[in-house]
Amino acid sequence: MLAQILSSGIAVGMIYAVIAFGFQLTFATSGTLNFGQGEALMLGALVGLTCVDTFGMNYWAMIPVVCIFGMIQGSFVELIGVRPAIKIKSEFGWIMSTIALGIIFKNVAENIWGRDALPFPPPLDMEPMNFLGANILPMEILVVVGALVMMLLVEFFNRKTIYGKAVVATANDRDAAGLMGINTSMVITFSYALSSLTAAFAGVLIAPLTLTGATMGGALGLKAFAVAIIGGLSSGLGIIVGGLILGIVETATGFYISTGYKDVPGLILLLLVLAYKPSGLFGKSAIKKV
């Protein structure tokens, strides 16, 4: 029983974590967040479904297409919704813009793909495997491995490539990076592209385990935001731990109490973190210069 809760909770938690990782990418470079991150996941899943169902693409060949689409969509969000707000130093403009764009993307998806939930053909056998008394789907293993690989690849990119080092430099001190000749506006656009790429990738990971539709991104995006706050927007490890905590707590609540209450413990934890450690469990407290 415990093994089943842990296995299911870890799979769910890693999806939350990889979406929340996108929040961390944009916050580090620009101090902003894409509140339409859930819609980036939804669009990735629906574009992936179209590639597989309509164009007959193999699931594995479809993933690069979805990732490229995610980067284009993320760049569009930054150029249209975030950059104008940053230029005029608006504290709330980017919030309203990203929310509005998320609503627009959802409405566009409803008009293109309809409002009905659609099944996504799984690339792996859906027959569960028994491990330590837990029934684990091969797709759940793929979700965990895929999420970890994606986050590790982004970290490798940031640490080992010249473009990644520009992202890190901008995250550390945007003004200093600009003085060193780094195009910080381009770096911020790129961070939004990477953020939406991770969300779109998460969409095609989770789609075979759920139904795909225009409404699938809202709840996932909100929970990923909670994970980012719980773990800490400045900590990659915190994002992973926060995702695992929320995923396992939700699964345990649904198993022992009721699925109708599975969202409650996570929200309570979010409120407690905001009240007692606003920077997150692993986040660094901001130092105010005077």
Where in the sequence are the language-model features?
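Membrane-interfacial amphipathic/re-entrant helices at transmembrane-helix boundaries
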Residues: 1-19, 47, 58-62, 88-92, ...
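Inter-helical junctions in multi-pass inner-membrane proteins, predominant
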Residues: 1-12, 157-158, 162, 188-231, ...
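Membrane-embedded helix boundary and interhelical linker motif in transport proteins
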Residues: 7, 29-76
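Short, non-helical or kinked segments that cap or interrupt transmembrane helices
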Residues: 25-45, 59, 88-93, 163-166, ...
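C-terminal transmembrane helix and the adjacent membrane-cytosol boundary/short C-terminal tail
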Residues: 34, 245-290
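Alpha-helical transmembrane segments within multi-pass membrane transporters and channels
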Residues: 57-101, 108, 241-246, 277-278
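Transmembrane helix-bundle core of multi-pass membrane transporters
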Residues: 84-85, 89-160, 187, 252, ...
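Helix-loop-helix "hairpin" substructures at the membrane interface of multi-pass membrane proteins
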Residues: 135-213, 236-242
